[in-house]
């Protein structure tokens, strides 16, 4: 870092001057590079700037130590990076992509969240307008980090609860899931009668995901081939006019 390099140079200069005379008095309120700068006769502005940098670095190191020891503020679920395909295994890739498309459609602010006003517009477009209190209750039911808005992960929780039958039929979230036209029927391992049935169902889910990925790859190849053919046809058409 530039600060460390400057501090090292100033310390060497101070040491050389100290050999020829008395020690420079320590400046109150300064430490590290700032103290070295002040002792070497650097301008007050330089010493203060270095002191501020030292304090900022110390604060960051203390913050990191607190987090490592579990003292600091925990990271909220909505800010945590997650993989929807592994965390919400009860849904197919197509279902999750449909939910993501719907989420982005109503995330008017493009900030990765659906706030109260955006949820209000969503419910109105779905033909089921809600009261202000009703909207707040909808968010509250899945708001894990208490920030009064829906992250994509919390949005997926709505459909998880709907698929598991955990939503009251007259609740706003149940209405949202029903009117979204996203089929949330699942083929997961819930309700398996035995361990072996659960294993078989888990294997089926895994193979289903592989099939969906292969289908997506084939679709992309098909689109690329069609694009290639269109470009070739266009070039051939151009050549006829030359």
Swiss-Prot record:
Q: Where is the composition biased (Low complexity)?
A: 32-42
**Which controlled-vocabulary keywords does the entry list?**
Acetylation, Calcium, Membrane, Metal-binding, Phosphoprotein, Repeat
Source taxon at top rank: Eukaryota
Residues annotated as domain EF-hand: 94-129, 130-165
Residue positions of the PTM Phosphotyrosine? 85
> Per the record, GO CC terms?
membrane raft
Residues bearing Phosphoserine are: 11, 76, 78
Q: Which residues bind Ca(2+) 2?
A: 143, 145, 147, 149, 154
> Which residues are annotated with the PTM N6-acetyllysine?
235
- Assembly and interactions? Interacts with CASP9; with inactive form.
What's the stated role of this polypeptide?
Answer: May regulate B-cell receptor (BCR)-induced immature and primary B-cell apoptosis. Plays a role as negative regulator of the canonical NF-kappa-B-activating branch. Controls spontaneous apoptosis through the regulation of BCL2L1 abundance.
State the protein's name. Answer: EF-hand domain-containing protein D2
Q: Name its species.
A: Bos taurus (Bovine)
Which taxonomic lineage is given here? Eukaryota, Metazoa, Chordata, Craniata, Vertebrata
């Amino acid at each position: 870092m530039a600060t460390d390099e400057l501090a090292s140079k100033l310390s060497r200069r101070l040491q050389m001057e100290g050999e020829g005379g008395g020690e420079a008095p320590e400046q109150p309120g300064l430490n590290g590079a700032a103290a070295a700068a002040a002792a070497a006769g650097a301008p007050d502005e330089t010493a203060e700037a270095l002191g501020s940098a030292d304090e900022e670095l110390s604060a960051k190191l203390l913050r990191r130590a607190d987090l490592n020891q579990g003292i600091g503020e925990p990271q909220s679920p909505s800010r945590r990076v997650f993989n929807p395909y592994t965390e919400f295994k009860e849904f197919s890739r197509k279902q999750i992509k449909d939910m993501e498309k719907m989420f982005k459609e109503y995330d008017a602010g493009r900030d990765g969240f659906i706030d109260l006003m955006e949820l209000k517009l969503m419910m109105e477009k779905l033909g089921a307008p809600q009261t202000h209190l009703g909207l707040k209750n909808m968010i509250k039911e899945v708001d894990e980090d208490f920030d009064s808005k829906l992250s994509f992960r919390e949005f997926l929780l709505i459909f998880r609860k709907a698929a598991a039958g955990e939503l009251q039929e007259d609740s706003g979230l149940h209405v949202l899931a029903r009117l979204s036209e996203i089929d949330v029927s699942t083929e997961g391992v819930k309700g398996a009668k035995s361990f072996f049935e659960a294993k078989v169902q888990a294997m089926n889910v895994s193979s289903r995901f592989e099939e969906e990925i292969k289908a997506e790859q084939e679709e992309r190849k098909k689109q690329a081939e069609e694009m290639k053919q269109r470009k070739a046809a266009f070039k051939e058409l151009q050549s006829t006019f030359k």
